[in-house]
Swiss-Prot record:
The lineage of its organism: Bacteria, Pseudomonadati, Pseudomonadota, Gammaproteobacteria, Enterobacterales. The keyword Hydrolase applies. Its EC number is 3.4.22.-. Protease that can act as an efficient and specific deubiquitinating enzyme in vitro. Does not possess desumoylating and deneddylating activities. The physiological substrate is unknown. The keyword Protease applies. GO terms for biological process: proteolysis. Pfam families: ElaD_SseL-like_N (PF22103), Peptidase_C48 (PF02902). The active site is at H234, C316. Keywords: Hydrolase, Protease, Thiol protease. This is Protease ElaD. InterPro entries: ElaD/SseL-like_N, Papain-like_cys_pep_sf, Peptidase_C48_C. One of its GO terms (molecular function) is cysteine-type peptidase activity. Belongs to the peptidase C79 family. It comes from Escherichia coli O139:H28 (strain E24377A / ETEC). It is an enzyme of class 3 (hydrolase).
Amino acid sequence: MMVTVVSNYCQLSQKQLSQTFAEKFTVTEELLQSLKKTALSGDEESIELLHNIALGYDKFGKEAEDILYHIVRNPTNETLSIIRLIKNACLKLYNLAHTATNFPLKPTGPDNSDVLLFKKLFSPSKLMTIIGDEIPLISEKQSLSKVLLNDENNELSDGTNFWDKNRQLTTDEIDCYLQKIAANAKNTEVNYPTGLYVPYSTRTHLEDALNENIKSDPSWPKAVQLFPINTGGHWILVSLQKIVNEKNNTQQIKCVIFNSLRALGHDKENSLKRVINSFNSEFMGEMSNNNIKVHLTEPEIIFLHADLQQYLSQSCGAFVCMAAQEVIEQRESNSDSAPYTLLKNYADRFKKYSAEEQYEIDFQHRLVNRNCYLDKYGDARINASYTQLEIKHSQPKNRASGKRVS
């Protein structure tokens, strides 16, 4: 990869930046590691050079971006001043990018690469996650959040943004976290989070999922099934377990609905009751294979209204993740553990914490959840974005000058 260098770009205008592309050198793995070492020692030019390389779309651009991101994400007493330099550099680049966007210059090269100079700053990227922490304007944070989270369903439409410390988790964030902790689980399975109702219908996503699973596998469910469900601005966790009674040769589905509030509402409760009961009264009666009937006779439904959000009004999604993790981990230790018992014990234990302790538990979970999203789900989205840029623009060059412009 050939790259030209800009240093002290906080003092460059966008026009100067476009007109001073002279000195170039080859980026290598050895160079990146050397720059990382000198950047960690506080060398500002190394930090700025890493940012220039990070603007690229090839593997070195990604590696440089990772170096900066992981320094910021894992602060120590020794790196606090370094992190401030990195954040300042990111914000300066972002401000230059806005200048270029608002007052675009005529491209200077046939590959249109000047226009692409700051493309990564407006695409899903780890640079974007660093920038968002530093941007003071809420509206700009929200715009970046839409890109970073691919928020097509406007889950952040209440004025919150990705960097808010007290906001609801999105569908993708919850799914990413739960899939990670359930990846090697043998006794519990996690299903993709959904809304309660199918749009423009009284039918629920849960009944669709249950119907599809039973049709494809009459012995389903073999493991405990967890369904994160958004009832409309609020997340709950539905647990389904098949109980076998060998004495009378019957099988039963037990359903536990974990709700971190003190109530769910009669309409929503009735909808969920109808979903479970309909397997016996409606769906199973229409199945030609009568052997399936015994799987769902006399279902039992328990609503566990845990009332955990006295101090954490926007943490229903976090509670779904933490409660699901409790079930998954405990059932790996003891597969006979009943979901209701595990969820009840979790809720009772959490209530014993002081308000300060609850805040800290919630805060630490959100950090882990965010990092999980960025490392897994976010990386996939970022890599897809890079791939599209590479295909469309055929390896655009990093543009910058080796001269310090004052």
